[in-house]
UniProtKB/Swiss-Prot annotation:
Keywords: Bacterial flagellum. It comes from Bacillus subtilis (strain 168). Residues 9-27 have a biased composition (Low complexity). The gene is fliE. GO terms for cellular component: bacterial-type flagellum basal body. This is Flagellar hook-basal body complex protein FliE. It holds the Pfam family FliE. It is found in: Bacterial flagellum basal body. Belongs to the FliE family. The keyword Glycosyltransferase does not apply. GO terms for molecular function: cytoskeletal motor activity; structural molecule activity. One of its GO terms (biological process) is bacterial-type flagellum assembly. Its main location: other. Signal peptide: none annotated. Residues 1-36 are annotated as: Disordered.
Length: 106
């Protein structure tokens, strides 16, 4: 038995083809814009350092009696603390993964 092709099936086929083309195009652009792991790590460490320095500067200004909003100082300190905790956890996971690889038998 032969079924007729409905207009909805044609539209679905065209939508699927368009989506496939978009995925292929985005994969091509993503591969050309990728940054290396070392650059990503360097940028992350730089950002972490900047947040730590900003927090220290605000804390020192507050301790020196300068006109600094306590809320902003506490928020900056918490952001720096969370960033440092995340970086420490990332380092721990990286070391753990390295140790696991070193335990593998060849």
């Amino acid at each position: 038995m032969i079924n007729a092709i409905s207009p909805f099936q044609v539209q679905n086929t065209q939508n699927t083809q368009n989506a496939t083309n978009q995925v292929n195009n985005s994969q091509k652009t993503d591969s050309s814009n990728q940054t290396s792991f070392s650059e990503l790590l360097k940028n992350s460490i730089s950002s972490l350092n900047e947040s730590q320095v900003a927090s220290d500067n605000m804390t020192n200004a507050l301790a020196a009696g300068k006109d600094v909003n306590l809320d902003e100082v506490m928020i900056a300190a918490q952001k720096a603390s969370i960033s440092l905790t995340a970086a420490t956890e990332f380092r721990n996971k990286a070391v753990e993964a390295y140790q696991e690889i070193m335990r593998m038998q060849m």
